């Protein structure tokens, strides 16, 4: 996270920031903080591109888009310690996922934002399978 803080504090005008797997080796709490820094960079006008396998990053982005337009946004920002620089307009975010086809090839698929944010089927399917196993394996 320190390099991102340095970028924000430096005042240097970057054309863009591209980061592969920014969540690598980070606890989910730090992933959320790192995502907050990336959003701050975006709100400073720095285009940010990331690749991720982190549902934590995805959910934080969704939360910040939802909070931006929430009817109680100011109240919730105070309650949870966010500032306007931490929030995102839905139209400022684009998400894609790689999807395998039946021919063994992979193609890029644009994801549409719902009123709850972006839904990533490849993440959700894996998480649902894990939850299903948890319940099955806990049965007596």
Give residue ranges: language-model regions:
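Carbohydrate-active enzyme catalytic cores, enriched for enzymes
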Residues: 140
């Amino acid at each position: 996270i320190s390099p991102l803080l340095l970028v924000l504090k430096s005042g240097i005008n970057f054309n863009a920031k591209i980061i592969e797997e920014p969540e690598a080796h980070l606890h989910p709490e730090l992933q959320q903080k790192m995502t907050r820094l990336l959003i701050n960079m975006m709100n400073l006008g720095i285009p940010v591109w990331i690749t991720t396998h982190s549902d934590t990053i995805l959910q934080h982005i969704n939360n910040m888009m939802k909070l931006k337009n929430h009817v109680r946004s100011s109240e919730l920002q105070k309650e949870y310690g966010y500032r306007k620089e931490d929030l995102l307009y839905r139209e400022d975010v684009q998400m894609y996922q790689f999807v395998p086809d039946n021919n063994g090839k992979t193609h890029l698929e644009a994801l549409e934002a719902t009123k709850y944010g972006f839904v990533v089927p490849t993440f959700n399917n894996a998480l649902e399978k894990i939850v299903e196993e948890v319940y099955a394996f806990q049965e007596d």
